Regions:
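Compact, glycine/acidic-enriched structural inserts
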Residues: 76, 81-103
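Short acidic-glycine loop/turn motifs at beta-strand connectors
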Residues: 67-70
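Short catalytic/ligand-binding loop motif for oxyanion handling, primarily in non-cytosolic enzymes
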Residues: 62-65, 82-84
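A surface-exposed partner-binding patch
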Residues: 1-64, 103
């Protein structure tokens, strides 16, 4: 899957790759860019949640994925399937706006 351009720009920036969010799910940890494709293969996302593509996690058993509509969703790593996907944001830009900034 081609990652959204705004997400790729974020990955290549000096902005935080982990930290707090202003609301649920409260924490994010973006996977290293060079590991995203393999991580999706390892968790068999195409088999269990077709149309989704993982890019991060919460450190507690849920991952964040881009959905078929370009939105950002939370999916459990155990019991992963499209019907349990929780919408978090309509786009990466909206998700990014939930990252708590310090200083």
């Amino acid at each position: 899957m081609k990652l959204p351009d705004d997400f790729v720009a974020y990955l290549q920036s000096e902005l935080p790759k982990c930290g707090e969010l202003s609301d649920f799910p409260l924490w994010f940890e973006i996977w290293p860019e060079e590991e995203i494709e393999q991580a999706n293969k390892d968790i068999q996302i195409e088999q269990y949640a077709p149309g989704f593509y993982g890019f991060a996690g919460d450190g507690a058993g849920e991952m964040y994925a881009f959905g078929p509509d370009g939105g950002v969703y939370a999916l459990p790593l155990i019991g992963m399937e499209p019907k349990v996907a929780k919408p978090l944001a309509a786009s990466w830009t909206e998700f990014q706006s939930k990252i708590v900034k310090y200083g």
